[in-house]
């Protein structure tokens, strides 16, 4: 009887020690990636399955709540896909701050299918037409470098690995059924805020060649939507859209503006208004919130019943619960290169 009691106490003690050990690890490393995620390399993660790609080309480490919502909504809509967030401020030796310091980053790192990687442009641009351009450029002297470096990186990543690139002010609401596609911002005009291709698609290779040949940092969008549009015109005979139907050209789909831009950039403030009857967005796959237009700092406010608050509540509920405050402590979506 005594031996059984001793054995029982020993087992209980071991269990308690194990629990305390795990608790200590979690308490001191709330921001760290789970071990099963930290050992997965980029190539292994993206080489055999499609993924969703986000970029942060500034040095900031704490994603604004709109970035958090974009990543969370993508992870929710594509639960079987890796959602990869490249961050310039993150390195292999970056010390992991506490949960209280960077709550959004900590939350995103804990989502099962979200993976955070350092943005190493030199490595990403290797074996592409952009590599020699990058080695010759003086980034500090370039206008709009954060946006241009983002434009270059997204082309190289999707060309190498395939998948879907999204700006960090895009809220996913349903899966995109296309493999090779561009998103129309308007008739005969393509955006580069969201696009998807299979690996090594020649359209993206030609885009990278044109990026270098016609590089001009003084022209806003020249390496971004203007590039996509002029290359699409080379590949396809563009026509006006008829109703809500997409255009097909070779093996590329040019998706109707309603798919991602049902509210145009001229009307971006409508996201921050209360609607009598909210739109269903039943033909849209994702919503681009035009955060770059939000120079006046319009905020997402808990309890406001604005369209954007209700989108957060439905499509990124954890971000809404943890990061969105009431009128006394409202926060805006900070501007960044990935939310144009």
Swiss-Prot record:
Q: Where is this motif: DXD motif?
A: 167-169
**Pathway assigned in UniProt:** Protein modification; protein glycosylation
Give the matching Gene3D superfamilies: 3.90.550.20
List UniProt keywords, sorted A-Z.
Glycoprotein, Glycosyltransferase, Golgi apparatus, Membrane, Signal-anchor, Transferase, Transmembrane, Transmembrane helix
Family matches, as InterPro entries: A1-4-GlycosylTfrase_dom (IPR007652), Glycosyltransf_32 (IPR051981), GlycoTrfase_DXD_sugar-bd_CS (IPR007577), Nucleotide-diphossugar_trans (IPR029044)
Q: Which GO terms describe its biological process?
A: carbohydrate metabolic process; epithelial cell proliferation; glycoprotein biosynthetic process; negative regulation of epithelial cell proliferation; O-glycan processing; protein O-linked glycosylation
Q: Where are the transmembrane segments?
A: 5-25
Ranges in the Cytoplasmic compartment?
A: 1-4
Its tissue distribution reads: Detected in stomach and pancreas.
Instruction: Report the glycosylation sites.
Output: 99, 138, 251, 282
Which Pfam families did the record assign? Gb3_synth, Gly_transf_sug
How does the protein's chain sit in the membrane according to the entry? Single-pass type II membrane protein
Q: What is its EC number?
A: 2.4.1.-
Q: Name one GO molecular function term.
A: acetylglucosaminyltransferase activity
Give compartment(s): Golgi apparatus membrane
Q: Name one GO cellular component term.
A: Golgi membrane
Does the UniProt entry include the keyword Cell membrane?
no
Q: Which residues lie on this side of the membrane: Lumenal?
A: 26-340
Q: What does this protein do?
A: Catalyzes the transfer of N-acetylglucosamine (GlcNAc) to core 2 branched O-glycans. Necessary for the synthesis of type III mucin which is specifically produced in the stomach, duodenum, and pancreatic duct. May protect against inflammation-associated gastric adenocarcinomas.
Q: What is known of its domains?
A: The conserved DXD motif is involved in enzyme activity.
Tell me which family the UniProt entry assigns to this protein. Answer: Belongs to the glycosyltransferase 32 family.
User: What's this protein's name?
Assistant: Alpha-1,4-N-acetylglucosaminyltransferase
Q: Which organism is it from?
A: Homo sapiens (Human)
């Amino acid at each position: 009887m005594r031996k059984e009691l001793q054995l029982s106490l020993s087992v209980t003690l071991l269990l308690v020690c194990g629990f305390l050990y795990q608790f200590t690890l979690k308490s001191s490393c709330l921001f760290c990636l789970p071990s099963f995620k930290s050992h997965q390399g980029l190539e292994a993660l993206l080489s055999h399955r499609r993924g969703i790609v986000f970029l942060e080309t500034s040095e900031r480490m704490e994603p604004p709540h709109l970035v958090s919502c974009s990543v969370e909504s993508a992870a929710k809509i594509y639960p079987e896909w890796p959602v990869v967030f490249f961050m310039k401020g993150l390195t292999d030796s970056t010390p992991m701050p506490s949960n209280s310091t960077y709550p959004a980053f900590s939350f995103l790192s804990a989502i099962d299918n979200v993976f955070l990687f350092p943005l190493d442009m030199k490595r990403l641009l290797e074996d592409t037409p952009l590599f020699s351009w990058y080695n010759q450029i003086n980034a500090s002297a370039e206008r709009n470098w954060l946006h241009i470096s983002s434009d270059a990186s997204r082309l190289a990543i999707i060309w190498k690995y395939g998948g879907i690139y999204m700006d960090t002010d895009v809220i996913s609401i349903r899966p995109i059924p296309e493999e090779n596609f561009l998103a129309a911002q308007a008739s005969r005009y393509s955006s580069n805020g969201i696009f998807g291709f299979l690996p090594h698609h020649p359209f993206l290779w030609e885009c990278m060649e044109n990026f270098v040949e016609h590089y001009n940092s003084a022209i806003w969008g020249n390496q971004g939507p203007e590039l996509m549009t002029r290359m699409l015109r080379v590949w396809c005979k563009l026509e006006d859209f008829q109703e809500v139907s997409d255009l097909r050209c070779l093996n590329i789909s040019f998706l109707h503006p309603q798919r991602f831009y049902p509210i145009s950039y001229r009307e971006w403030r409508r996201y921050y208004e209360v609607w009598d009857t909210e739109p269903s967005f039943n033909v849209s796959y994702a919503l681009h919130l035009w955060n770059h237009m939000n120079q006046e700092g319009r905020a997402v406010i808990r309890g406001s019943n604005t369209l954007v608050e209700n989108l957060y509540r439905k499509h990124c509920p954890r971000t809404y619960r943890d990061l969105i405050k009431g009128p006394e402590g409202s926060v805006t979506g900070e501007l960044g290169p990935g939310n144009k």
